[in-house]
């Protein structure tokens, strides 16, 4: 089968690009013919205040950089390129209404089957006319694959039945790490907050929980690893005001894959104090390194964490509850049993299974 992908791929960084690459690679292993119709430019600078949109990643799969979603003249060129390649299936990566006009134009004109792979239905930030934009982009899809039950419910709540009934429940597979570094025992307990930092991810909640955690575990260390969408000043000020400098280590930058393993190897547990969520690539990354997770029980996060076996779930936006879970994690010595549980479950929900679901 000839399978085309529409959306970001290397050298664009981020979870959407990474997900598409893993899935495309799996299709290639299954002997399908792949073509990536990549973005030439993804966002104008005003919509991406966290700096460079690129990293050093690359792909051996065939890829052409054509689409600039905010430049209409690129839409017809991308459409023609897809049609000339004559795919049997087009998989479009979706996560923001920003792409609705360009995607809608292309998807309603291609002559192959269309699957929208929806990482979100309701965006984390408010967008004017979200329902109208979603309807326009999604109405040409033969199927809409979502990655959590929460996302499927959002689809049914947001769009009319003639579109939402095309929804199919998929899942976010566990990533294959570049290298699985076993946990390295540290001189102090180590928490990890990882990934692109936006307000909805609740880093402020974690920082407010840290003084409570420190009372019980004086030598606790939190590593914050990821670029900030906007300014890091708000978090730096909180760290100073809460007198956390001795307990918090900040790496406010994008971390390439080659460094990721090191941060997980020296961390006891990954913290996801999200205020809202659908699912999270950070969970898939943490599980790939057999790192337990403490996360807010919001959206689809609970679907990927086996409470008290691979991690702990806490109420969202609740620093005392988050602190209590971290303290319990250490007091009850949960790390090693959770690592063993994660290792035993890593062979489920694979990329091969997701690829088969999409083909079927």
Regions found by a protein language model. Give the residues of each.
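N-terminal strand-loop element at the rim of the active site
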Residues: 7-13, 24-84, 151, 166, ...
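Donor nucleotide-sugar binding/catalytic pocket of nucleotide-sugar-dependent glycosyltransferases
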Residues: 139-179
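Acidic donor-binding loop of glycosyltransferase active sites
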Residues: 262-278, 291
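Conserved donor-binding/catalytic core segment of Leloir-type glycosyltransferases
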Residues: 184-201, 207-210, 223-225
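A short, well-ordered alpha-helix in the C-terminal region of glycosyltransferases
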Residues: 219, 334-348
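Nucleotide-activated donor-binding/catalytic signature segment of Leloir-type glycosyltransferases, i.e.
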Residues: 235-258
């Amino acid at each position: 089968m000839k399978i085309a992908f529409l959306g970001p791929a290397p050298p664009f960084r981020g979870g959407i690009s990474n997900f598409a690459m893993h899935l495309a690679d799996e299709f290639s292993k299954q002997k399908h013919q792949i073509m990536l119709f990549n973005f030439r430019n993804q966002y104008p600078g005003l919509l991406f205040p966290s700096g460079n949109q690129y990293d050093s990643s690359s792909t051996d799969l065939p890829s052409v950089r054509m689409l600039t979603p905010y430049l209409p003249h690129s839409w017809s060129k991308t459409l023609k390129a897809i049609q000339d390649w004559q795919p049997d299936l087009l998989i479009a990566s979706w996560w923001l209404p920003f792409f609705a006009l360009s995607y809608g134009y292309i998807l309603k004109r291609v002559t192959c089957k269309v699957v929208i792979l929806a990482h979100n239905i309701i965006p984390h930030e408010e967008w004017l006319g979200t329902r109208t934009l979603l309807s326009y982009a999604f109405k040409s899809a033969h199927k809409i694959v979502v990655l959590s039950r929460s996302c499927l419910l959002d689809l049914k709540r947001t769009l009319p039945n003639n579109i939402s009934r095309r929804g199919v429940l998929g899942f976010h597979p566990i990533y294959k790490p570049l290298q699985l570094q076993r946990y390295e025992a540290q001189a102090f307990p180590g928490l990890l907050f990882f990934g692109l930092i936006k307000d909805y991810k609740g880093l402020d909640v974690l920082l407010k929980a840290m003084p409570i955690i420190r009372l019980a575990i004086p030598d606790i260390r939190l590593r914050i690893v990821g670029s900030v969408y906007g300014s890091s000043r708000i978090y730096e000020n909180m760290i100073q005001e809460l007198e956390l400098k001795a307990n918090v280590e900040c790496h406010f930058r994008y971390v390439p894959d080659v460094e990721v393993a090191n941060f997980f190897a020296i961390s006891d547990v990954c913290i996801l104090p999200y205020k809202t969520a659908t699912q999270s690539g950070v969970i898939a990354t943490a599980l790939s390194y057999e790192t337990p997770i403490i996360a807010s029980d919001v959206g689809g996060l609970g679907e990927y964490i086996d409470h008290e076996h691979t991690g702990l779930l806490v109420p969202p936006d609740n620093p005392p509850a988050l602190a209590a879970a971290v303290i319990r994690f250490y007091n009850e010595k949960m790390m090693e049993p959770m690592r063993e549980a994660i290792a035993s479950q890593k062979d489920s929900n694979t990329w091969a299974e997701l690829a088969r679901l999409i083909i079927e």
